[in-house]
């Protein structure tokens, strides 16, 4: 069992797009209407949007490979790329997406540790993320990894307003 990571570049756009759609759809389709899923996937993961994100110097994506097969990725943001105003001392983990077939292999922990490594390299004092209040597995994982809920914000899945919990962890 080998685990490797690779920083994504613009050349990885198609792979990133396919992986994003697959993992998001597999995770959330049972709890959301097909119309809202379609609207969100088309908005969040269209080619233009992902090109913009990949080109942003304040965002980074890293693929994770398990036994040489792509299994998921993490996206982190600093400064003005953060989806909420959390200040210069914070790093946001915007996405940790792992294919269903690769879950329960410790890959989420690897991706989270990569985010922490980046935060520490950049002298960030905190890391934070938003997680859907109904995503109980993810919430339990983040709590186990030392995150605490610090607030909440609205997240729109198509035309449906949902609540994301803001969870944070102090690093320094």
Curated annotation (Swiss-Prot):
Keywords, alphabetical: Acyltransferase, Sporulation, Transferase
Residues forming the catalytic site: 142 (proton donor)
Gene Ontology molecular function: any one: diamine N-acetyltransferase activity
Domain N-acetyltransferase: 3-172
Residues under site feature: May have an important role in the acetylation of the polyamine: 142
The protein's assembly and partners: Monomer.
Descriptive protein name: Spermidine/spermine N(1)-acetyltransferase
Provenance organism: Bacillus subtilis (strain 168)
Gene: paiA
